[in-house]
Swiss-Prot record:
Organism: Rhodospirillum rubrum (strain ATCC 11170 / ATH 1.1.1 / DSM 467 / LMG 4362 / NCIMB 8255 / S1)
The name this protein goes by in its record: Nucleoid-associated protein Rru_A3472
Signal peptide from the UniProt entry: none
Keywords, sorted A to Z: Cytoplasm, DNA-binding
Role according to the record: Binds to DNA and alters its conformation. May be involved in regulation of gene expression, nucleoid organization and DNA protection.
Length: 107
């Protein structure tokens, strides 16, 4: 029974720490950019878009399609960085916890 109590305590600690990490991630800013930095997208640590900056030289009606492509590229760059950051944080958090194969945390 001591083992079960210890496991429950560890699970509670993990749950508390996960909530803390979620708040830390939400407070972080991660920016991604397209080629030459003409478009920069900044996400929070959970993947929400905080801002989009567009080089003024692109604000030409003829450049709409180019601008859209650059925004997509910048967003994808920032999202990949966020995903990697979340993976690293969760790895730190679960370092001592052995999860069953195929099981992952809710991130």
């Amino acid at each position: 029974m001591k083992n079960i109590g210890q496991m429950l305590k560890q699970a509670q600690q993990l749950q508390t720490r996960m909530a803390e990490v979620q708040e830390e991630l939400k407070a972080m800013d991660v920016s991604g950019q397209s080629a030459a930095g003409m478009c920069v997208v900044t996400l929070d640590g959970k993947g929400g878009v905080r801002s989009i900056k567009i080089d003024p030289s692109l604000v030409d009606p003829k450049e709409t399609e180019v601008m859209e492509d650059l925004i997509v590229a910048a967003f994808n760059d920032a999202k990949a960085k966020v995903d990697e950051m979340v993976k690293e944080k969760m790895s730190e958090l679960t370092g001592g916890l052995k999860l069953p194969p195929g099981m992952s945390l809710p991130f």
